[in-house]
Structures are given as structure tokens and as C-alpha cells.
Amino acid sequence: MKDLLKFLKAQTKTEEFDAIKIALASPDMIRSWSFGEVKKPETINYRTFKPERDGLFCARIFGPVKDYECLCGKYKRLKHRGVICEKCGVEVTQTKVRRERMGHIELASPTAHIWFLKSLPSRIGLLLDMPLRDIERVLYFESYVVVEGGMTSLERSQILTEEQYLDALEEFGDEFDAKMGAEAIQSLLKNLDLENECETLREELNETNSETKRKKLTKRIKLLEAFIQSGNKPEWMVLTVLPVLPPDLRPLVPLDGGRFATSDLNDLYRRVINRNNRLKRLLDLAAPDIIVRNEKRMLQEAVDALLDNGRRGRAITGSNKRPLKSLADMIKGKQGRFRQNLLGKRVDYSGRSVITVGPYLRLHQCGLPKKMALELFKPFIYGKLELRGLATTIKAAKKMVEREEAVVWDILDEVIREHPVLLNRAPTLHRLGIQAFEPVLIEGKAIQLHPLVCAAYNADFDGDQMAVHVPLTLEAQLEARALMMSTNNILSPASGEPIIVPSQDVVLGLYYMTRDCVNAKGEGMVLTGPKEAERVYRAGLASLHARVKVRITEEVKDGEGNITTNTGLVDTTIGRAILWMIVPRGLPYSLVNQPLGKKAISRMLNTCYRVMGLKPTVIFADQIMYTGFAYAARSGASVGIDDMVIPEKKAGIIAEAEAEVAEIQEQFQSGLVTAGERYNKVIDIWAAANERVAKAMMENLSTETVTNRDGEEEQQVSFNSIFMMADSGARGSAAQIRQLAGMRGLMAKPDGSIIETPITANFREGLNVLQYFISTHGARKGLADTALKTANSGYLTRRLVDVAQDLVVTEDDCGTHDGILMTPVIEGGDVKEPLRERVLGRVTAEDVLKPGTADILVPRNTLLNEKWCDLLEESSVDSIKVRSVVSCETDFGVCANCYGRDLARGHIINKGEAVGVIAAQSIGEPGTQLTMRTFHIGGAASRAAAESSIQVRNKGSLKLFNAKSVTNSAGKLVITSRNTELCLIDEFGRTKESYKVPYGAVLGKGDGETVNGGETVANWDPHTMPVVSEVSGIIRFADMIDGQTITRQTDELTGLSSLVVLDSAERTGSGKDLRPALKIVDAKGDDVLIPGTDMPAQYFLPGKAIVQLDDGVSISAGDTLARIPQESGGTKDITGGLPRVADLFEARRPKEPAILAEVSGIVSFGKETKGKRRLVISPLDGGDAYEEMIPKWRQLNVFEGEVVERGDVISDGPESPHDILRLRGVHAVTRYITNEVQEVYRLQGVKINDKHIEVIVRQMLRKATIESAGSSEFLEGEQVEYARVKVANRKLEQEGKVAATYGRDLLGITKASLATESFISAASFQETTRVLTEAAVAGKRDELRGLKENVIVGRLIPAGTGYAYHQDRIRRRQLNEPAEAPQVSVDEATANLAELLNAGFGGDKK
């Protein structure tokens, strides 16, 4: 027995390892893995089906085919364990060793490993410094390479053709050594002296100046160093021994009908063995060189195909003409080892079925069909049956269950009680796609789902299916109950809003019961309380909507949790009073004393959660649902065609629009407007008409006139069913009702452009054939889009998860004082996102002061919850610096304070929370709701483009930011700076509106003046850019020569003449170098200086500028000297929706990006070339000037002599995030990406917390490029993990050495995922071959820090409940404690024994 226990112990292999290293395998290493050489290509004997000896399935090498039985059958049973049969040479052991024992093939000639040869950049090529083409020619026996030059003029690794080789032989005899084939490459690699080579290259690096050469040298140095450090030998990249995969991993399966299905690998191996054996024979026979060479080449090709079929030349195909699956194909791609078997596996104890509604369930329950439960919980039932003594053996229990005896059902009930199951609906886009429920047994075959969790699962009941999983172990059950129970997931991790919100019928029911109606039955009653209200309603004495007075008792909790009650009569309705009965005590009555739409209900649940906590909220949500369903049924709201009331005004509006269109058509035909303008105007007219029809329709639908008690007429909100459904948010929207009862409006073509003839009919009137045809256009596009969208969205999520997977909260506080400044998002007159929503759940980075005082309002490191946010709003704080993941100082991971609140729980985040994955899911999950299309600015959109004034909406005072201005003769301000912002501040000092003001705008009111709502505060001409004079004086023309640099033009309509500056391309010879400008002089003729500088006021005019003043005219400051027409760039496409989000996260440089100033200084223009201008910026402190060539067609925002700051926009365009990072820093790029991504989601009405985007940005910024190495071991220009630079610099500073300097890099998410430290994670993401090749050559260690690596090696992940386990292991490793030896308990031993004995004795029962 002792031996047996010892044997069982030996079977549990060690799981204690800290890292995984990948390296090149040396021939000795391969031989040490091997259990024997495979000499024959045979697989199994066709008659006996026994494996052939020395073949690919040989039992002697790989192990027995049957458990504990040798091949010839001499030794059977467990007692001969470990014996090697003398007859057939097979060891008697378990057959599963055939999954792990490897063999090998001794190759007759070395062959190069194709990965190191062809995976770019070619490692062999880099190492030998030879072009890949040359190496290939040597390998495939087309030319010779000099291995040893000896005393001759031949260089080492020089390529010789056949003729050159023969000539050299004649000339030098055997002074030199040249070979061909892999042997040649092998000996070249063997002769490399890595250390010396490295030294030489480093010296070269210091001497060289050319950029390309430096790059090449650094690459080679890095590769050489990798070889030196990792202990890999270069010659191992050429194989002399080929390992053979264990046979059970490349099985040969007999099919019925005597045929066999085989793995492609067997074919590939067979091919290698055949060629190898033939080559051996040829060598023994001393065959002619040319034949041997051919055979060697074929062997090389066979090995290539085995390792990576199709990488070189045509892929080898099988009998069915499709390429064979090689070893590389086994691990890469969606069907490869990583993604198919390691990252996701099929699991036992699971089932799936269609789902239906369970409206009577509680929130934590799901209905499980009895049949399914019986199958899923079988082992538990067997155990219980045996325990109770109802069945003597497992077999008997099995029989009972199969017969479905009555007692079995009772046992099932017991087993299921308190045993949660997991329900999952594919696609699982975020963590709420798997939740735990307590099963309730039901008849039938469909799983019943609680309606409120449908939103989280995105489930509906039109045939969706769901899978059930049973957590088996106690720990798993505990986790399911404590963390995954649906009642614990009330808030969405993406936005922190409740995700368990009623929708559809429930909303309709609640809306119906909380509406009031004029002169309803029972109006004016005074009731003692909600109970009486319900009684009068049930008795039919009062209607649900009657306006009554009811005595209501409210309980209010204060900060300390003391409860005060106040009771009083409230004006309300019967329905609201009845609803009040289910509202938890502690919430104010005002929450229900309003018509409840979807938003109001969501707010009510949110308030309930924040005030009352989890349990009351869950009970309340359930009650809301039951009540809602009940009253929706009572309301009897239904839809008939007469409910779609068509407004009378419709015909008139459409006639007016048609008249306008006709007028524009006439203008077009008489040539007053261009085709583009006509198209845009027509679309504008129809869009406006559509809006008017919709408005008339909604006015018509939403109100009705009724007679009240006093007999007077009164307007009240309508009880039209369609309107109620839309108004409550239950189903439908104003846009849809517009199509039913208004007009369908403008339709789009599949390419996104708008068809200019609208559909004037609606669905109630019906469409004619043409209208119907136009409609089908857009509808089909929609369907095609949806399919594309799903795939793209899924891929975006995958990339996001991959880049962020290893980000986990690892400490409580990193102690940084850094953070990002949060301000409300304001666009024009709208506050898109108030400050409180942006800072809620964040931690302050520094003390927040009361505005205008030095009192501390909120101390540093405070988690801003709802109460603090209310305080901030009362004190009207405008901007707050909060901690952010981007500025977190934690090396690997983030700290809790920088992250702030765990949105799904409402308190500060716990250590070990996988914030990276949560962020990725939160951004990716709504991806399918985003549009795929790029918007054309045309029609409705172009109206916004040509704004020419600012009208404020609210009363307040104006404030200008980064503004330079001059006062013109009329006493108004003229803006002379580029990125000016104008904000409107209310009386509390809060920013209400914010506008961009262009250069040359004239302000009606000055800085700090008060304005009223609706006042126009700024005007400008949208179509031209003025040149504004900053000084007063007399104009002098410089270099303005008629016919050379300018021409005169006369306007046909007005008769006024103006000067137009010629573009330098249009000028003749002498005019080329002239630079037309306007100088401003005083009465004496001296130059006037620009105030505050010693520069004369002269304005250089670009081509196409129009001057309407004459030489010698006196002007005053603020006057327009010239106008530059702005070409409208036609209809520019704005990338919207999903592609835009992907572009931002991939950090793609836009086409024609904005040009930003690289340094601060004064702008001037140097010598021009054919198509480009030379922009020169001279720093004010007299440093080196910065020059840049800019294409002529770019419109510049700066004039000569203007002062720009670093990072200012010189030429407009979409900004490149890389430029923003380089010139404005990390915070600016974070702000840019966050705002741009939010912009896309906001358009779709999706709420995502900024945090999640910041988390991804942090991961995009995790690399840095070394600028100067200091005393560190980094190379200049090397890209290193930012955390590693920080750690190294800290160490260097402690030792008093020079730290390395670096610049942060922004990587797109795909690149960032592939550039991670962990090769396992990168290889399982994309480009598996390249990642593994790189890692093997460098001998990389994977420290298994991230989640993915740990999933792949089959451990608990270092996050969530696995976090403690990993922390414990790290602690033990630091204390150098021995890993606990795996203890085998008696139970396990008996279980294993039983398994062994069953295997031994019951083998022949099959």
C-alpha cells in the first residue's frame, strides 16, 4: 500500500513554477526529450492494426497502445507496471504516456529552421549580415558560400556561383573552404564570435552618422546581445535532429468502412523520413554530387513544410488538394492551440436551451427545466441516493435516475436548493453576460429568465438560447453566490448607472398608473392614505388617474442614519398613491409624484441604491416589475391605425417647401448658384420642412382638449396609446412616429449621400412605387451594415482586451500628486456633460479650494461621492484636478486611489480587480450599437459648418480665453489670435456655454461684460479669412506690382475694383522672388512697430488675397486690410462610429494632419521650393531656428512675424495624437483621445465612464524610447517598457549615477499588445510565428504577470479571488520557503486507486 501511495504521489507533477522561458533547442536537448529514433515511415500494420516497430506510432518508443499491456500481450495488468517486455520491447504503463513521449529523427544532412530563416526580419540573415536571397540560394543549392577564406582574396560569407567556384578552385586549390546547403550556413554560424562581433559593432555605432546605418547596427547589436545573454548558440537555428510529436497528438483514427482518418502531420513526417532515409542510402552508396544535392534540397523542403507549410514556395497539398496543416498552423489562428484549447475550452456539466419569460420569478431566480436539472446534477443525485441508503451502488443509483423514480425528484429538489447555476448568453460582450441564479424547477423544456436581467444579457425572447453551467466545488459556488449573483450586479460596470431597469411593458404600466387626467372619476377626494386609495380604486369609485389629496408619511434619513418622519396631505393621483406602497421607506414621495417614464424610473432605482443600499433596491426592482406588468395589462393600451393622427398643416408645409425648391431650381438654371449649393439648399429646405411637419404632428398627438369640472376647456397631455408608448420610453420614438403619421423624409443612398427628393408620404397614407423603391435602398444598406458591424465590433473588443488584460489594481495608493484637470464638456450653448458626472467616483489629486477664497472645500485624496459632488455644485466649482490611471505611479498595475470608485459596486475599488478587462469590455460592448458609416457633410450637416455669429442662450458674463484683440474705430474688439475661446459664466461663476471664436471676429461685448440670453456677441464672415491690422497708420504697398504680383479685378455687380495677389505659381520670372506685403507707416513715413515688440507692422499677403484699399490710405487698428478667400473643402467625409473609435485606439496618423508648431517662437517664411513653402520658427531666446517644409495647398493659420507657442496649430486639420503627445504631453493626449471617443459614444446615447478610456490610454503609453542612456544598460533609440525605465532610473538615482532620459511613445492597441513583455500573451493574440521566433532567439522569460498567460498555463489568474493566491506565492518566494509538497489525502488516494483498479480489471468489459 505504501508503494502505491508513493506511486500516486509521483504522478502529481510539480505545478510550482514562477516563469516560463522559451529558447532554441540544442540537438542534445532534443535527443534528451526523445524516447527513441523513428527510422521508418510506416504507421500501423494494415492487417493487425498494431503500430509498426520503429515507425511513426512505434509502441517501443512512444509507449503501449492499451493501459498496462505490452504490444505482444505477454505482460498484462497492473502488477507488471514498469516492466519492459523482452519480446516486443514495450514498457508496461498507462497509455496516456503516448501523449507526452517524444521521438526524434537523426537528419542525414542539417536543415535550416524555416522560422529563423523566413520570419521577417530573418534572424539568420541578421546574424550573418547576409541578404535573405543569398542565404536562400545557398540553402537550396544554387550557389556556394565561402566558409573559410584562408590566405586567399576570398571574403568569408562571400557568395560564389558554380562557375566562380570552379575558377576559384583552379586558382587557389584547397586554400579555401566553400560549401553549399545548410551545412555551409551551419558552419558560418558556428564560427561566429559573438562577443567580438558585438564589440566591433558598438564601435561602428559610435562612429557612424547615417540614420539608416545606425538603425541596422542597433538591430544587429540587440540580436547578438540576445544570443549572448540567453545562452542560445546560433548554430542551433540549423537542425541536425528533428523532434517527433507524440503520436496521440497526431492521431490515426479508424473510420467505419476500413478507412483511416489521419492528422496531416503524419503525412508531413512520413515525407521527411522517406527523404531522409533515401539520402542516407545515397550517401552510403557515394552517389554523384548532383543527385545527393537534389535529395538534400528535397529534405530541406520537407522539413520546411513540416514546420511551417506554405511559408516558402507552394504549400504541399494532400490528396484532397488542400494544403496540409503543419506544426505552425496547429498553434496559430482561431482554430490553433492558443485560442481553441488554451484560452477557451468546452466544459462539462453544461446544457443549453431556448429562453422564455419568467415574470413571476424573483430577481435571483431562473427557471430550470426538470429534465435538464436532472442531467446536470447527476453526480450530486447519485451521491445523495447512496448517502440516504436508497441505492447500494452507483450503478443502482444510475438505474433509479434513468427510471425517473419519484424519490429521485425529491432528491433533486434537495440537491438544487441553495446551489446557484450560471446562465450565459453568447455573445458574452461584458462580464454581465454570465450571471448566477438560483434554479427553480419547472415543467417544459425552456429556461425561464427574469425580465429585468434581459438588458444585461441583451436577450429577447424571439428564439434566443442560453447555456447553463453548474459550479461544482464549494469555492466556485461561493464565488457564484457572492460575486456573480444577479442581485449583486445591479449597476453597470461601464457607467455606474443601474443596468437592472424596467423596459417596455413595465415602463408603460408605471407610466399609465402615474399619469393624471382632468375631471376623472373621483377627482377631488381626500384620502387617509395609499391603502384607502387602493380600496376606492378597486371598488370602482375612482379612476387611476384621478387628482386627489392623500395623506402620505415620508421617512427621511440624514447623514448619521437617523430617521425623521413627516406626514402631510399631498396633491397627487390614485395611481401614484398605490405605487407609493411598494417604494422602500426612506425615499422621498417626490420620486413617484410625477409621470414616470423610463428615465425617471432609472433615476428612482439609482437613488434607492445610493440611499438605501443593495437589498431594498433588489426587492423594490422586483416589486416595480410585478406592479408594472399588472397595470400595463389593466391599461389596455393598444395601437390602431386611427391613433396615428396626421396633422392638418402637413399639406401646406409641403407645398411651401416645393415652392422654395422650384425657386432655387430657377436660380440654378440662371446660373446664380452652383450645382453643389443647389443640392445642399434643397436638402436643407426638405430637412426643415420635415422638422415642421414632425412638430405639428407631435403637438397634435401630445395634447388633447378636455372639459374640466367647472365646464371650462383645458389642455392636457394626451392618452393616445402611440404617444404614451413613446413618451414613457417603453417603445418607439418621435422619429418613428414621424414616419407613421408625419412624413418619412429624406432617404440616404447606400453610399451615405442623401437623395434630394424626399418621401412626403407617411406609412398611414402608404407609399407609392417610387417612394417604396427609394426606401428599400437605405433598408438593405442597414442590414448589410449590421453584419459588418458585429464582426468589426468583436475584433475591436478583442484587441482592447488583449492590450489591457494585465492591468490589475495592485496597491492602495501610489502617492502621486499628479492628475488630470476635469472641466465640464461644453459644446456651443450645451453642457454636454456637467462636471459632477465627470468627477463622480474619482479621487481628488490636490485640495479643492472654495472659489475666490483659500478655504479648503475638499481635502486631497477624497473619493468624490454624490454628497461631495452636491457640495461642489453648491460652491460652483468649475474645474477639479483628479487622480487618474494615466498619471498613476504604480509600476505594474494601478493603485486604487488613481482609479477611484468601482462603478459596479459604488465604493473605492478593491485590490486585485481586473480593471483593464473591465475597461475593454465597457468600451467594446456598445460597439455594435455604433454606426459603421462615414458621414458626408452635405445637406443638414453643412448648415452648422458655415456659422457666422455667436448667439448666447443664457444670461451671464463673458470671459475670453487665450485671446489677443485690438479695438477698431467703432470701439469694438477684433480678435487677432487663433484658438480663442469665449465662455459664458453665470452668476455662480459656472461656465454655461463655450464657443470657439475665429481670427478676425468682431465682438459686440467685451471681456467681463454681462449679456442677456439670445444676444449676438460675435460676428464674422465664414467664407473669407481677414488680415486685421493691429496698429493705426497709413498703408504702403511693398512689392505689389501690377501684372507681376497682383492683378486688378472689377466686380460685375457692384463695379468696385479690387487687387488680387497672384499665387507664386502664376507669377512670371521677375515676380517669382517678390513678396507682396502691406506696410503700415506713420505720417512721417517711418515704420509703425507692433505694440509690445520691436517688429515693424508689415503683413505679407499669401496668394489669392484680395485687397480693397489703395496705397496711402490711412487706416485704424482693427480694420481689415485684406481678405483671403477660404475654399470650402467640398464635402469632406467625417469618419464616424466604430471606425473612428478604432482609429483613435490604433493611434493612426490621419491623412493630412494638422501641422503643429514644434517650438515656440516667431514665424517667418524661408525660400520656397516648387510645391512647398519653408516655414521657419525662430525661438525668442535666440536658439536654433526650426524649419519645416509645408505643401503649398495647406492653408496656414499664421502670418509672418506672428508669435506661436509650442503645440499651436499652424495649419488646420485633424490632429495626430502622436504630435499632441510629443508637443503637449501625456495629459493633453489623454484628454484628446478621451474626448474624441466619448464624442462618438455620446452621439449614440451610450454612457461610458472616462476612466475606462484612460485605462486603455495608459496601456497605449506603456513604452518609452530611450533618448540618452546615461549609466543604464539601455541602448539609445531602444524602445523599452516605461515601467522598466522608471525602475532602472530609481535604482540609478539611489546609486548616484546618471539616469536615462526618454520620450513616451504612443502605440496603437494592436502594436501595444504585440509589444508586451509577455510572449505568451502576444503569441496568443496575433502573428504567433513572429512573436515566438523573436522570443525564442532572445531566450525570453515570461514572468506570468498578466491574466492571459496564467489562463494559458492553467493557473488561477492574478486578479479577483486568485489575487491572494498569487500574492501568497510571491511572499513565499521572497522568504525562500519551499513550495508546499502536494499532499495526497487518503480520499484522493482511494479515488485514484479505484480509478486504477477499474482501469486494470474492467478493461475487458467494454
UniProtKB/Swiss-Prot annotation:
Belongs to the RNA polymerase beta' chain family. It comes from the Bacteria. One of its GO terms (molecular function) is magnesium ion binding. Binds 1 Mg(2+) ion per subunit. HAMAP family: RNApol_bact_RpoC. Keywords: DNA-directed RNA polymerase, Magnesium, Metal-binding, Nucleotidyltransferase, Transcription, Transferase, Zinc. It catalyses: RNA(n) + a ribonucleoside 5'-triphosphate = RNA(n+1) + diphosphate. InterPro entries: DNA-dir_RpoC_beta_prime, DNA-dir_RpoC_beta_prime_bact, RNA_pol_asu, RNA_pol_N, RNA_pol_Rpb1_1, RNA_pol_Rpb1_3, RNA_pol_Rpb1_3_sf, RNA_pol_Rpb1_4. Zn(2+) 1 binds at residues 70, 72, 85, 88. The RNAP catalytic core consists of 2 alpha, 1 beta, 1 beta' and 1 omega subunit. When a sigma factor is associated with the core the holoenzyme is formed, which can initiate transcription. One of its GO terms (cellular component) is DNA-directed RNA polymerase complex. It is an enzyme of class 2 (transferase). DNA-dependent RNA polymerase catalyzes the transcription of DNA into RNA using the four ribonucleoside triphosphates as substrates. Coiled coil: none annotated. This is DNA-directed RNA polymerase subunit beta'. Zn(2+) 2 binds at residues 814, 888, 895, 898. Mg(2+) binds at residues 460, 462, 464. SMART domains: RPOLA_N. It comes from Photorhabdus laumondii subsp. laumondii (strain DSM 15139 / CIP 105565 / TT01). GO terms for biological process: DNA-templated transcription. Its EC number is 2.7.7.6. Its cofactor is Mg(2+); Zn(2+). The keyword Hydrolase does not apply. The gene is rpoC.
